[in-house]
Structures are given as C-alpha cells and as structure tokens.
C-alpha cells in the first residue's frame, strides 16, 4: 500500500516530468534501431505500465534504451521490424527464465567501484548525447538551455512542491511559442502516433530458421537489458535508501518486453537517466511509474500537437541536470584516499563504457579486473608449512587454495 499511496503528490508530479522527458528519447532510440518512431513510443508507455505492477524496484523507470537499440540495428536492417518484434518476445522469455533461476542475486558480485564507474560513465554519455542539440544552432538555443538550467536549480528556493524540471519544460515551451522562436522541437524528431496501439502477432514464419535468426539477438538483448536494469536498481536503492527485489525485477522486465512486443513495441530495460529524474523530482513509489506511462500515452495520442511544440532546449537542460546529478563527484576526491586497485577498476569501467558506448562491456571489464584483483589479494593470504617425516611430507595450509596460490606448494 505504501508503494502506491505513500507519496501520491510527489509520484504524480514526477511521473509527468518523466513522461515529457521520455518522448524525445524514445523517438531517438527508434531512429537508432532503424524503426518508425511509434515503435519506441509504444514501448515508452507500455513498459512503465507493466513495471508499475510487477517490478521489483519502485520508482525505477524502464523503457526503450540506447543500449538495447544498438543491438537491434543489424536485425532490423537485415530482416525487418517483424523479426525485431519476435526477438523482443524471446528476449522477454529469457528474462523470465533468469528471474525464476534467481540470477538477480549475481549482482552481489559487482563491486562498489564498478557501480561507481558505471554511474560516472553513464553521466558522461548522457551529457555527450546532448551535444548534437547544442552544435550548429542559433543563440536562442544556448539562451534557452541556460535559462532552463537556471529554473531547474533556482526554482526549488521558491517552491519545492512542484518539480523544477516540469516548470522548466512548461515555461520554455510557453516562451518559444509566444515569441515564435526558430528552435528545434520534439515534433522535429519524428511524427507522433495518432491512435492507440492494437494487439498484433509478429508476422514471421514459425520455424527453426526464424529461431536461429532471432536467438543470438534475443540472448544479447536479454543479458544487456538485465545487466543495465540490475545496475540501475542498485543506484536507485542507494538514492532512496530502500532495498529492491532483483529477481522480481528480472521477471517483470521479461513480462514487460513480451507485452510491448504484442502491441508493436521494441524491447527495453531500466533507464538510469529517467530513473534519476523521477527520484530527484520526488518520485518514490509505483504510482510514479504508472503515472509516467499513462501520461505519456495521453500526451502522444491526445495532446500530440502541444507536445510537438516542446523545445528540445528545455529537455537538454533537464538531461544536463540529470548528468550533473548522476555523476559521483566524490569519487574524484576519493582517488587520493582509496586503494589504487579500487580506483583502477572504477576508471577502467568508465573508459570502456565511454569508448564503446556499451554499458555491458564496461561493467564486464570492471568485474573482470575486480575479480583478478581479488584473486591476487587472496593468493597472498595463504601460509604453507611442511614437515618431513621419513619418506613422506605433511603440508599444513592456512588460507584459500586455488590456481593463483598453488605455487606456494613448490
């Protein structure tokens, strides 16, 4: 009950902010994947609706994401949208299986330094993603972005009830429409759908060849989706100082991806940027996620003419705020005080994610380096004594015996 009705006002207002911020991202991710914008937008409202009821991390926002979209490019290019929908269904099945196998518990093997590196890298990527909107533009865009940041950071001193990102979007949209400013808007990103989605089945042959085509894509999408979702859940846990059910989250991601595929949407996962917006705007319960999905549906179907007028500069200001708030500034100061090995893991995670734009590669690199570092440390904490008694030698071992410490017997 507390998850639903404990933070009604904050959840509703935060959900509205998230819904507005989701629209351009969903369109952008659709373009990356090579599909029509409505595919990403259908996912952007369907997945949050499902996650609100079944998710294991209240206040976390899931939708179509860039990491998932990148994995879909080749499949869409070679085989088309229908195979993507089929792959999204199989992705959901894999995630359901992972949830029932309790693979969410594997998150305890991800060190804090890897999580910090993941957060910092994502903050950098979020900021970098805004740069195209700030290059080769008129001075109006810079002025509106600066004004938006001013509203976001100064409005809380006047009123903390209404989320400042929402005020930023409303005010800048009003100014742009009133002054008829020549700035890029949400409508310039792509056409918004003008009708509700309908139930459909992927139009693909039900045979072994189809399975062999979609299987590798589905496996990759399932792994990346769960990895990003589990990492985001951990971050929201820290921000709200509350626990989450990782295995329930795995199952819910699977259900959500299956459902969105049956209405023509693409597979998705948790979004750290939108989750941070939600939490920082006051969202704490499941109602915030539900509100985001419902409001987004209403916006794109019934209020699309108004939504299309939102200047991208307003959303850029919101995302820059997210980037600044997401980055762990304390980790820079901790480079002097933390052990070198911990800092190396964090920096390596950041470097790989930023270089490849692939969160999974970065996290796996960080986990690998952390594991090697742990194995090296453990191998040092082993003492071997031996006693020769006639023709036999007796060894007494204190510590862990494994491949890295085996040379102590020689």
Regions found by a protein language model. Give the residues of each.
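STAS-typified acidic loop motif
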Residues: 387-410
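Transmembrane helical cores of multi-pass ion-transport proteins
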Residues: 1-373, 378-382
